[in-house]
Design a protein with these regions (language model features):
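Alpha/beta-hydrolase-fold enzymes
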Residues: 67, 73-169
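A generic structural signal for ordered alpha-helices
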Residues: 10-14, 103, 157-160, 175
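Gly/Pro-rich cap/lid or specificity-loop segments adjacent to the active site
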Residues: 1-55, 62, 66-78, 82-89
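Hydrophobic, aromatic-rich cap/lid helix
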Residues: 167-179
Length: 179
């Protein structure tokens, strides 16, 4: 994004961290519209987006119907459901329980010394609820990473490897304060 929790707070010349102001989908769309204005784009041919991007698509349609005559929201809703709010709360709790969270003020720590374990756990939780049980069963079943293993205490299942992969991928590109 254009700015976020790692941006410098002009009040104290340090990263905002956990005191970064809350923003809404409407705020994001207003900012996008200003960028479009700056670029001289008065009307989009179509706007498409999935998940949180889909919420932005819906907001474009509500706020600027004349600028967004065709919208295609994918895998989204007008607002988060109670269940989605609950899943998000559990993910944020996983981040906050990481000892390297430091109340969201970890930007001045050594590189790589942020709440990566908590963020990876939050991502694993999210990945589980993004798919159905049938989808997990079809893709992974009970397959082990090491096919020659005898189901020992520390053997790893393919599904665990999948969750680890997505957690590692997220911590390389995402700020835990933005979760």
């Amino acid at each position: 994004g254009s700015t976020g929790p790692s941006s410098i707070n002009p009040v104290n010349n340090r990263p905002y961290g956990s005191v970064f102001p809350n923003i809404t989908i409407r705020d994001i769309v207003r900012a996008q519209a200003k960028v479009a204005d700056y670029l001289g784009i008065n009307k989009w041919h179509a706007i498409i987006g999935g998940s949180m991007g889909g919420m932005q698509v819906l907001e474009w349609g509500a706020m600027f119907p004349e600028r967004a005559p065709r919208i295609a929201p994918v895998a989204t809703s007008l607002a988060a459901s109670a269940q989605q709010i609950a899943w998000s709360a559990v993910g944020r709790a996983a981040i906050a329980l990481d000892p390297r969270w430091r109340d969201g003020n970890y930007y001045e720590s050594d590189p790589g010394d942020g709440p990566h374990a908590g963020l990876a756990t939050a991502r694993a939780i999210a990945q589980i609820h993004y798919r159905s049980d049938a989808s997990f069963q079809s893709r992974f079943g009970r397959d082990l990473v090491d096919k020659d293993s005898l189901f020992g205490l520390w053997d790893r299942f393919e599904v665990e490897s999948y969750l680890d992969y997505h957690g590692e991928k997220l911590i390389r590109r995402f700020d835990a304060n933005s979760y």
